Structures are given as C-alpha cells and as structure tokens.
Amino acid sequence: MGFEELLHKVGGFGPFQLRNLVLLALPRFLLPMHFLLPIFMAAVPAHHCALPDAPANLSHQDLWLKTHLPRETDGSFSSCLRFAYPQALPNVTLGTEVYNSGEPEGEPLTVPCSQGWEYDRSEFSSTIATEWDLVCEQRGLNKVTSTCFFIGVLLGAVVYGYLSDRFGRRRLLLVAYVSTLALGLMSAASVNYIMFVTTRMLTGSALAGFTIIVLPLELEWLDVEHRTVAGVISTTFWTGGVLLLTLVGYLIRSWRWLLLAATLPCVPGIISIWWVPESARWLLTQGRVEEAKKYLSICAKLNGRPISEDSLSQEALNKVITMERVSQRPSYLDLFRTSQLRHVSLCCMMMWFGVNFSYYGLTLDASGLGLTVYQTQLLFGAVEVPSKITVFFLVRLVGRRLTEAGMLLATALTFGISLLVSSDTKSWITALVVIGKAFSEAAFTTAYLFTSELYPTVLRQTGMGFTALIGRLGASLAPLVVLLDGVWLLLPKLAYGGISFLAACTVLLLPETKKAQLPETIQDVERKGRKIDRSGTELA
C-alpha cells in the first residue's frame, strides 16, 4: 500500500484539508505585503533642491523657486539641479527686478543639489527615499533594495528547500515565521541604508520559507484529484494580500510603521503552528511512525472517515515507508537527464523568467499614470480577481499552452502599444497598464497550473521549485530595468515587452496538457514527447 492509498482511506479532501488551507492562508497574505512593499516604502515623492533662505510667505515661494530652479521640458521644476546664481526675480514689494551681479553672461549655469532636497509630504510622511535621499545620482540605490530583497528570496529558497526535507515542513515554517518577525523588526529600526538593505535581504531569505514550505505542506495532505484546483484557489490569497497592503499603505504613511504593520501578522502565524499538521508522508520517510499515525488519525476523524486499526498498524505503515523509500530523492540535475525533460525544463525556465519579469516590472513601477499610488494598487489588486476567473475557464476551453502563450503575448502587446501612446494621454496609459497587469496576472496563475502538469509525479515538486527559482531571478532584475530610462526613456517598456514576447514564443514549444493523463514517471514524459515529435500534435 502506497501513501496515496492510505490518504484515500483517511480522506484526501475534506474538513481536515480545508482547515489546513485556512491555516496556511496567512503566509500567502504575508508574501505580497512584503514582496510589493517597495511600492509604498520606497516611493519617490516630488522633490527639488533644498534652497537657502526660502521665504516663509507662501505667496512668494513659487517666485522663489523660479529664481533658483531650472525647468524640465514638461514645464515642471527640476528635481536634481538648481541655478548656480539666482535668476531675475520681480520684487513684489518694490515692483522692480533684482539681479545677481555674479551671474555670468550666456546660458544660466546649473549645479547639482549640494544642500539636500525638499520633498512633497502630502502623500507620504516618510519613505526610504526621503530619509536617505535616494534620488537623482543615488536613484539606483533605491531600486537596488528591491533587487537585494529578491536575491535574498532566491538564496533562501535553496536553503529552505534542503532544510525542510531534512528537518520537516512544520518546524521550518515556524523558523520562517520567527525569522521574518525578527528581521522585519530590525529592518523597521534600521539606522542607515546599509543596515536596511542587509536586513531586507535576510528578510527575503526568511520569507522564501513560505514560498517553499506552504505549497508542499498543503499538497501532501491532498489527493491527486484536488491538488491542482486547490493550488489555483490558494493564489487568491495573494490577491487578498495585495488589496490588504493597499489599505494598510493608505492608512500608514510612514515607511517604518508600514513595515512594522506588514511584519506583525507573523505573531498569529507563530501561534497557528500549534494546529498546522506536519506532512505525514515526510514523517513516514523519516521513520517517525507514531507521529505520522497521530496526524493520520486526526485527518480521518475530522473528515468523518472511519478507519480500522489495521490500516494504521505498524506493519501497514512500514509497508508505506518501504514504498516511499524505494523512490530515489530527485535533484535538479534529473530535470535535464533526458531529451524531453531538458526541453520541458528549458522552456519552463524562459516562461517563468518572462512571467516574473513582466509582472514585477509592471507592479513595482507604475509611474506616470495620473493616479495616486493607492488608486493604482487598488486597481491592480481588483483586476487580479477577473484575471483568475478568466483563466479558470480559458484553460478548460482552449488549453493550458494557448492560454499561457496568449496571456504573455497580450502582455507584450500592451507594452508595445504603450510605446506608441503619448505620455500626455494619462487615461490611455492607465488603461494599458491595468490591462497589461490583468494579462500578466493571468499568465502567472496559468504558469502554476501548466508547470505542475508538465513534470512527472516523481519530479513535480523539484521542477516547480527549480522554475520558481528562475522566476525569482526575473523578479530581482525587474526593478533595475527601470534605470534604463536614463539611456532611452522607452527602453524599460521595450525590455519588459520583448522578454514577454520571447516567453510567449517559447511556451508554444511545450506540449498541451488539457485532458491529458498526468505523467507519473520520466518514461511517461519521454513517450509523450516521441508521439508529439512524430505527429506534430499531442496524442494523449
């Protein structure tokens, strides 16, 4: 008797699994609250050079700025330069003009801001940009914080993947909660930029535990029939986290208190560990029969499935252990051992890189829309709901491959069209970005489902973990691409759209999995690939 048969006896889907789904919803809410936190925490409000002896009289301030600050091409005051010598200023009181005798002839000389900056505090009371002046020449350091965070997530995923197999999912989930809480508090108390970047990278590593542990802990208690559906449904908690972050960000305008608010939910998470079950499958592979028996009994009781003592006897569980241990633990190298697996893995790598690259590129930099950051994120969060509903029907109607390729291609097209639309038409730009976000989210949701059906059972978790790592690489690079606007204003959009287009083309090289039997072994993948090679279409 294998574990799947044992799980069928105690109930592969019921109140026990639903309770588990609810208990593991909190990490899914926490992830977007930290992953998308830079939208508010690292926001750059309108700013200009700090000027000496600025008048207290508000009616004179605009005239004062005109004498000290050059204009940009759009008519706004420069954010990074000031005049070396004050320009002519009509004297409101005397009706004369005052000139600085030190002004050389010719074009007015401009210099960088040497005395710091003044910021518009109407939308944010403080951000990391305003606290450490991460603007102008230091603008890149602001983007680096997000990149370092996602690098931390990538590295943490490798560590947690190994440790959770060695010490258990439940124990490492507790470690993830505690370390996220501690490091989040340290980040909020950062006294300088270096401390902040370091603690945020470590926080990303801690949060990676949720991305690696929660899904297996959920799926290993579900029967095969309900795993895919539960996996897609659980992504709605991410959308809930996006909307919750928008609300919290609107209520809390200081980055330190906002970071604290995003971190404190770890406290009830730590308490919830008491009710989270360890994976019985993992316990059996470790020879911890009594613990596995305890959780299996609880599962059967909550699901209302009467089970005989013989089914959970030492002898019966030892047979399950024997069958589980027969299978060699897979590694990332196994994903490239055969020709068809190499094909699937390479295509999935490009797909996941493109999905993450475009999603975080759109989400983390939505400037120039003519909306407040809160309105933008509310739109972004709201549009994810119809995106998931659309995916639910499309994958059944036209299949996984065409849905994924179509959504990535549509994302690329929105970037392409936005290149042709004038930045002055805010309404059109806003509509394109929101539509692009909807397509990008749909591609993200489909990618989870599609990837899980491409890999055989023996490599499914390994394949999902590996492609997710590649995706996080795309997420870490996405914030830096914005800096390319210094080379050419349209280059970031071209990069996001180009990668999305390449990913869409790559997806078309993958086999369709709609109504196809899921592969169990590597041999199943190879046989399926040979059928496609001979006929050009899948013979499921």
Curated annotation (Swiss-Prot):
Q: Which GO terms describe its biological process?
A: alpha-ketoglutarate transport; monoatomic ion transport; organic anion transport; prostaglandin transport; response to stilbenoid
Superkingdom, according to UniProt? Answer: Eukaryota
Q: Tissue-wise, where is it found?
A: Abundant expression in male and female kidney. In kidney, expressed at the brush border of the proximal tubule S3 segment (S3) in the outer stripe and medullary rays. In kidney, expression is higher in female than male. Also expressed in female liver.
Q: Which PROSITE patterns match?
A: MFS
Record key words, sorted: Cell membrane, Ion transport, Membrane, Transmembrane, Transmembrane helix, Transport
Which GO molecular-function terms appear in the entry? alpha-ketoglutarate transmembrane transporter activity; organic anion transmembrane transporter activity; prostaglandin transmembrane transporter activity; sodium-independent organic anion transmembrane transporter activity
Q: Which family does it belong to?
A: Belongs to the major facilitator (TC 2.A.1) superfamily. Organic cation transporter (TC 2.A.1.19) family.
Question: Its biological function?
Answer: Functions as a Na(+)-independent bidirectional multispecific transporter. Contributes to the renal and hepatic elimination of endogenous organic compounds from the systemic circulation into the urine and bile, respectively. Capable of transporting a wide range of purine and pyrimidine nucleobases, nucleosides, and nucleotides with cGMP, 2'deoxyguanosine and GMP being the preferred substrates.
The protein depicted here goes by the name: Solute carrier family 22 member 7
What Gene3D superfamilies has UniProt attached to this entry? MFS general substrate transporter like domains
Gene that encodes the chain: Slc22a7
